Design a protein with these regions (language model features):
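Rossmann-like adenosine-cofactor binding region
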Residues: 100-170
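Alpha-helical segments flanking ligand/cofactor-binding loops in enzyme cores
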Residues: 7, 71-72, 151
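Phosphate/diphosphate ligand-binding glycine-rich loop within oxidoreductases
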Residues: 1-45, 168
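Short, charged/polar "capping" segments at the starts of alpha-helices
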Residues: 2-5, 88-94, 169-170
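Short, ordered loop/turn segments at secondary-structure junctions
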Residues: 29-30, 86-88, 127, 166
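Glycine-rich phosphate/diphosphate-binding loop of Rossmann-like nucleotide-binding domains
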Residues: 46-125
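General beta-strand structural signal in soluble alpha/beta enzymes
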Residues: 24-27, 33, 59, 108, ...
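A short helix->loop->beta-strand "cap" motif at the edges of active sites that frequently abuts
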Residues: 20-22, 79, 154-160
Length: 170
């Protein structure tokens, strides 16, 4: 019995799995990053010594594959998730509609200070996400008020900070 981990596009995975008799898991795709989020959930519980369902989780940053997986984890593990991002970079309408149907513990703020208030854990990622084809300077400027620094961290509930690296533009 074997498991294979592939970093392929979603549609290639779907096609590829039709030719296998063993399980295939999504390690990373443009739409999700479940293995990272599952390992983050384990890390959070190990450090905080509490089930994640008892913690307030915060995401500061762009809506991307990691956030989509964190949203799915929030529904699955029943934890509060506060998302802080500029309005233009909120999760897609499809994701927001799914959240409304599945969870009342996910909140979106266009103000980082409101998003981190009371957070036990703060997640972030690069501002320029996987396969982003954007004006980098402009996007970084749009996230200026969402910089995670000591001042923002002090507004949390003595939060731990998780970032997938490399760092520098979070």
């Amino acid at each position: 019995y074997s498991n294979y981990l592939f970093e392929l596009l979603d549609n290639k995975i779907e096609n590829f799995k039709n030719h296998l008799t063993i399980p295939v898991i999504n390690g990373l795709s443009p739409s999700s990053h479940p293995t990272q989020v599952l390992s983050d959930v384990f890390t959070v519980e190990e450090i905080k010594k509490k089930p994640i369902s008892k913690l307030n989780i915060c995401w500061i940053g762009d809506s991307n594959n990691v956030l989509d997986s964190l949203i799915a984890a929030s529904v699955k593990f029943s934890f509060q998730l506060s998302i802080g991002c500029p309005k233009k970079f909120e999760p897609s309408r499809k994701v927001r509609e799914w959240v409304k149907k599945n969870n009342r513990k996910i909140f979106i703020y266009n103000d980082a200070t409101k998003a981190v208030k009371g957070a036990d854990v703060i997640f972030s990622d690069k501002v320029i996400s996987l396969n982003d084809k954007v004006n980098k300077k402009k996007k970084i400027e749009q996230f200026k008020k969402f910089k995670i620094d000591k001042k923002l961290m002090k507004l949390s509930n003595n939060a731990i900070f998780l970032h997938c690296l490399p760092r520098g533009n979070e």
